[in-house]
Amino acid sequence: MPIGVPKVPFRSPGDEDASWVDVINRLYRERLLFLGQEVDSEISNQLIGLMVFLSIEDDTKDLYLFINSPGGWVIPGLGIYDTMQFVQPDVQTICMGLAASMGSFILVGGEITKRLAFPHARVMIHQPASSFYEAQTGEFILEAEELLKLRETITRVYVQRTGKSLWVISEDMERDVFMSATEAQAHGLVDLVAVE
């Protein structure tokens, strides 16, 4: 029998008694956000809403985005990335487990000098993909053009945020490139590796 989402006590400033809230809600109140699934429109909208709300609530305290994601949809991922750049507080990104594909793109979008990977984390970058086999010929051409534009955008961001050359990033994105935490640090995807 499932136990559901664990509840923890939370006391608002000025309240005498604590109320019980689910653990994720409690962590959000501490500005700790989680991307622990494939990136899709639903999780993207939730994270965007939380970042905007927490930014309005206090624009001086950093946000912490913990990432354990196999990647996912490109456009919702770009929405998360753009919001991270838009909100006033710095967004610190922490890779735990895996940040692959769009997960690594969001990871690299954290505030430079505040991007961290746990020691056994893995990071993977590659080019965006599409399901061409489902499209008609005309749609196929349009989709290929859009995919090339998205690849250029993603490549430019990696170049800007890693300090690596366009040639190096373009070469790496030709195939799935998996990296350890220290390799990701050497590649400029993260700034720090947590110690064991």
UniProtKB/Swiss-Prot annotation:
Family annotation (SUPFAM superfamilies): ClpP/crotonase (SSF52096)
Top EC class for this record: hydrolase
HAMAP family tied to this protein: ClpP (MF_00444)
Active site: 101 (nucleophile), 126
Physiological role: Cleaves peptides in various proteins in a process that requires ATP hydrolysis. Has a chymotrypsin-like activity. Plays a major role in the degradation of misfolded proteins.
GO function terms (MF aspect): ATP-dependent peptidase activity; ATPase binding; serine-type endopeptidase activity
Protein name as catalogued: ATP-dependent Clp protease proteolytic subunit
CDD domains per UniProt: S14_ClpP_2
